[in-house]
């Protein structure tokens, strides 16, 4: 089954709104993870995150969503096109931790998979992502993990099948490390 580009855009927009709302809701079960007024949010990722820093990208939409809920935050855009988990780990200190965020969203996986032989194996991906989360949590940064969206519009292509194992790991890691999870891939399976 093919999914249109417009459908993917709607899902990304919906994600930004849901993410910002979820991060702002001061419910008792979320009280210890809700974004507070004045906090900084780093957005670590690849080209999707880099484009998210544009005026109508998901980084700006999330910040505007929080503002509409009365929560003023500062964005730290840290997306670089083409980057994989190993590159994000290598620049984590410089691009994220040195800026002392309270929160970090992590969007990583598409390039690890679809770059083929230049990609990152599932085993190495698990090590890289776990280290990123561990470094952030050791620095007192709360982490929201985003599962990766589809590669192309065909759910059944080989890359999407491979990506599903990476996303399964992210879901498992979020539970294990008590990270917030935005399961962007849930509706695309």
Predicted segments with their positions:
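N-terminal secretory targeting modules
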Residues: 1-44, 48-56, 63-72, 97-102
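Alpha-helical cap/lid subdomain in secreted, periplasmic
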Residues: 35-37, 60-74, 87-189
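Glycine-/small-residue-rich active-site loops that bind phosphorylated ligands and cofactors
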Residues: 50, 84, 113
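Short beta->alpha junction loops
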Residues: 77-84
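Cofactor-binding loop segments of dinucleotide-utilizing enzymes, especially the Rossmann-like FAD-
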Residues: 46, 80, 148
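A structural signal for the hydrophobic beta-strands that form the central parallel beta-sheet
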Residues: 43-44, 77, 145
């Amino acid at each position: 089954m093919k999914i249109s580009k417009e459908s993917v855009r709607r899902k990304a927009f919906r994600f930004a709104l849901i993410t910002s709302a979820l991060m702002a809701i001061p419910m008792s079960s979320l009280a210890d993870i809700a974004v507070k007024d004045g906090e900084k949010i780093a957005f670590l990722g690849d080209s999707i995150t880099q484009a998210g820093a544009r005026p109508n990208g998901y980084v700006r939409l999330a910040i505007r969503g929080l503002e509409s809920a009365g929560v003023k935050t500062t964005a730290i855009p840290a997306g670089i096109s083409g980057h994989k988990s190993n590159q994000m780990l290598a620049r984590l200190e410089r691009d994220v931790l040195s800026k002392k965020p309270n929160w970090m969203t992590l969007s990583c996986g598409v390039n690890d998979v679809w770059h083929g032989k230049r990609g990152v194996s599932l085993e190495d991906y698990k090590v890289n992502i776990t280290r990123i989360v561990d470094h952030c949590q050791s620095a007192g940064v709360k982490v929201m993990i985003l599962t990766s969206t589809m590669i192309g519009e065909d759910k059944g292509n080989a890359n999407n099948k491979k990506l599903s194992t990476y996303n399964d790991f992210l879901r498992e890691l979020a539970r294990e490390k008590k990270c917030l999870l935005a399961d962007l891939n849930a509706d695309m399976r």
